[in-house]
């Protein structure tokens, strides 16, 4: 970052989390924190995990950019560890052997301790081991991934670890803000199981708009064929995907195709009609087949049709958009050898919050060096964001989740809409006023309906901005400016305002104005081509996810929280922007570095790699995942079933998935049964953790299940469960409360249609 005042400047983080979750500390470092990694003499084992170049693991480098190292062996060096912790603000640790946490907290009662374990510190699975594949199985994603009639398909990469990292960073920052307000530290007990579930594809949170308000727990038991929602077609040089959803998009597609008469009727404006039509899909295929990906994209832009070519990762990182935004930067990983790595995921005040240095060499003896700033924090409160006013202009998943994260921790979040342009999350197949997913994802908010196209509505909104602390949005770049709310206007109305916006490709660059539905962004970032069955390049199966929406919301919330922390020491606001495509690619750091090594003709070494086994179990479509990490796991597995995968499959087929999971975990092998979303609330570990709880809504007939607590904490209360608002449900009260308007003034706004009040 070239900014002279990054938002977390002066915040000190002690990072004792090895492996891929080192990304938590790296992200906090990109936002400006001083991060010191703790590792034993000789270096941590994660330094040489996976692909290595000259003995340096690329995954290690990706997770630890910008950190320094303190070499500490516990318990022998306990005094040195306590001395470092005494000077820290946040301690990240993952069951660090030899750690005397009581001594650490006695030395620094204001320390925020984030203790991370695979399954939490209570419940029957508390001592079990997880892997990315195991977490996919246990968080509901695996059961939906793949094609009908086929075995489930493990998603590519390390999505559960990589999405959990920003969720944990968010919890750490929220607890730190609470510390700044109260002077008291905290200990968060974070279960990776929950963090991954919440930030990837939460079964009891917001789902994509194509679900039409139907939550994931109401979907069919098996894997359903969702490819018609976001269909992929072969073209002259590969594949392209269309996302023709809105009527205006269909009209653009119809004109582009030459207005074929067989599709001219008004019924084709309706999404269900188009979804059900094999003839329409065949017509799309014939029309697109002669064109290249670039020609399809150009034609789609000209006609207002959402479309994207399918890229592989090497193509994705070289697009004009990524080059223009400096999304990747070279980092020296060995003497004289530099490789490309993701250059952060957030723009702060128009400047990239990117790489702050290489990964550290082993053997360091780092001490904290950053100056201690003075923070002018709000008065103490039970919730970290109590008293904070948030204008939530976000839509669908990213926007909805960003606002809810603040609302759940005490902020007054006002969802800004208009009756003529409601949030697409409100749509439901039964035309209910509040869908189940909307009710889950917008709890604890107030509703304001305002006419932002009128001069009086604009002026009223700027009056609200003047009293707000945070403004969230995820429109296509330029939308707020077109309404008269550009960055300068907002800052003039309120110099202390913090803004956070999220878009498909970011606010700058040649692709900034592209229509950016998640399925298209996944194509442009290389993920769609990877989410296929081995050896079957056309078995595309990524339609079951809304990734990266939920994790992008966490990244945006973290950026906003960081700017609020900066505001406590400077008095000024700021802006954060997130590109969802860059979020995806940033979570492929080691893979991108390996591609750079390959392009440079460098030879990578790979030791023993973890191997994920998908084991069919007794029952109907029942499976268990096992991850064989090393020789010890192979020996443990051999002691149960023999060394061959075929023998393991035969053994598993005679047992229930619960039995297979339990026996493998008892032998020390990471394993997880394939859990369906509908079964998660009754899972013994989720019950022990208190992950879910029942909720009600006055417009929904029966109680329903939602996420409860995000983690266990000594000081952070569980979130409230105030019902999600109808459009404009609180309009009159909001303008009266925020602006001090009397009844006559509010009545005039209502009478003139400047604001709307739900009946």
What are these regions (language model features)?
Residues 151-163, 394, 540-550:
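Cysteine-centered functional microenvironments
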Residues 52-57, 129-135, 206-207, 325-328, ...:
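Short, hinge-like loop/turn segments at secondary-structure boundaries
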Residues 30, 39-78, 418-459:
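Conserved N-terminal Rossmann-fold NAD(P) cofactor-binding segment
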Residues 136-140, 166, 170, 174, ...:
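Residues on a specific face of well-ordered alpha-helices
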Residues 402-407, 428, 435-450, 454-468, ...:
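C-terminal structured domain segments across diverse proteins
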Residues 139-155, 527-544, 714-715:
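The feature captures the short pre-catalytic strand/loop hairpin that immediately precedes
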Residues 91-143, 454, 473-529:
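N-terminal Rossmann-like NAD(P) cofactor-binding subdomain of oxidoreductases
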Residues 1-46, 61, 71, 76-94, ...:
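Acyl-CoA thioester-binding alpha/beta core of soluble enzymes
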């Amino acid at each position: 970052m070239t900014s002279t005042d990054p938002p977390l400047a002066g915040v000190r983080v002690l990072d004792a989390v090895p492996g891929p979750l080192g990304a938590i500390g790296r992200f906090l470092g990109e936002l400006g924190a001083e991060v010191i990694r703790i590792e034993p003499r000789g270096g941590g084992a994660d330094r040489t995990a996976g692909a290595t170049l000259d003995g340096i693991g690329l995954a290690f480098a990706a997770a630890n950019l910008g950190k320094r190292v303190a070499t500490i062996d516990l318990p022998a060096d306990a005094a040195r560890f306590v001395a470092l912790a005494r000077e820290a603000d946040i301690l990240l640790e993952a069951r660090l052997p030899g750690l005397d946490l009581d001594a650490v907290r006695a030395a620094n009662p204001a320390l925020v301790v984030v203790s991370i374990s695979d399954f939490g510190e209570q419940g029957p699975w508390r001592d079990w081991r997880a892997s990315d594949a195991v977490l996919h199985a246990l968080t509901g994603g695996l059961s939906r991934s793949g094609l009908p009639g086929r075995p489930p398909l493990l998603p590519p990469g390390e999505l559960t670890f990589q999405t959990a990292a920003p969720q944990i960073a968010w919890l750490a920052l929220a607890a730190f803000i609470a510390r700044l307000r109260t002077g008291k530290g905290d200990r968060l007990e974070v279960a990776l199981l929950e963090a991954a579930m919440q930030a990837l594809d939460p079964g009891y949170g917001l789902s994509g708009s194509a679900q039409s308000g139907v939550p994931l727990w109401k979907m069919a038991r098996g894997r359903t064929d969702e490819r018609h929602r976001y269909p992929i077609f072969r073209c002259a040089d590969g594949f392209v995907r269309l996302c023709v959803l809105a009527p205006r998009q269909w009209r653009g597609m119809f004109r582009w195709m030459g207005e074929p008469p067989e599709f001219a009727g008004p019924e084709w404006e309706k999404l269900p009609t188009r979804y059900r039509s094999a003839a329409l899909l065949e017509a799309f295929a014939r029309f697109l087949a002669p064109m290249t990906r670039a020609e399809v994209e150009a034609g789609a832009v000209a006609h207002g049709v959402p479309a994207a070519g399918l890229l592989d990762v090497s193509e994705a990182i070289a697009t004009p958009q990524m080059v223009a935004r400096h999304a990747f930067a070279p980092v020296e990983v060995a003497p004289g050898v530099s490789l490309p790595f993701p250059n952060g995921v957030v723009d702060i005040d128009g400047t990239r919050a990117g790489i702050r240095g290489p990964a550290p060499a082993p053997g360091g003896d780092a001490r904290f060096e950053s100056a201690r700033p003075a923070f002018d924090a709000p008065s103490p409160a039970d919730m970290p964001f109590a008293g904070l006013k948030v204008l939530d202009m976000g839509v669908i998943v990213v926007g909805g989740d960003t606002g809810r994260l603040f609302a759940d921790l005490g902020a007054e979040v006002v969802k800004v809409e208009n009756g003529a342009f409601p949030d697409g999350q409100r749509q439901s197949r039964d035309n209910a006023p509040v869908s189940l997913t909307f009710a889950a994802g917008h709890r604890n908010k107030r509703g304001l309906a305002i006419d932002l196209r009128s001069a009086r509505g604009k002026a009223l909104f700027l009056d609200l901005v003047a009293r707000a602390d945070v403004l969230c949005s995820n429109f296509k770049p330029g939308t707020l400016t077109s309404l008269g709310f550009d960055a300068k206007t907002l800052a003039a109305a309120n110099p202390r305002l913090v803004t956070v916006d999220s878009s498909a490709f970011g606010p700058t660059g040649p692709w900034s104005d592209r229509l950016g539905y998640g399925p298209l962004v996944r194509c442009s970032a290389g993920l769609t081509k990877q989410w296929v069955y081995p050896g079957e390049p056309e078995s595309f199966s990524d339609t079951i996810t809304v990734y990266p929406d939920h994790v992008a919301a966490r990244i945006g919330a973290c950026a906003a929280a960081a700017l609020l922390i900066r505001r406590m020491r400077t008095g000024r606001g700021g802006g954060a922007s997130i590109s969802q495509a860059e979020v995806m690619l940033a979570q492929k750091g080691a893979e991108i570095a390996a591609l750079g090594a390959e392009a440079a003709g460098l030879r990578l070494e790979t030791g023993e790699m973890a191997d994920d086994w998908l084991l069919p179990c007794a029952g109907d479509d029942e499976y268990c995942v096992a991850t064989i990490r090393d020789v010890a796991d192979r020996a443990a597995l051999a002691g149960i079933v023999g060394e061959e995968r075929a023998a393991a499959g035969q053994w598993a087929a005679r047992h229930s998935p619960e039995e297979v999971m339990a026996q493998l975990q008892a032998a020390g092998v990471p394993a997880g049964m394939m859990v369906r979303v509908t079964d998660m609330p009754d899972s013994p570990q989720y019950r022990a953790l208190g992950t879910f709880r029942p909720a009600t809504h006055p417009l929904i007939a029966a109680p329903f299940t939602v996420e409860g607590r995000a983690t266990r904490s000594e000081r952070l209360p569980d979130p409230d469960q105030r019902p999600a608002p109808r459009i404009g449900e609180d309009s009159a009260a909001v303008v009266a409360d925020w602006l001090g308007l009397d009844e006559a003034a509010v009545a005039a706004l209502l009478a003139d249609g400047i604001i709307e009040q739900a009946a």
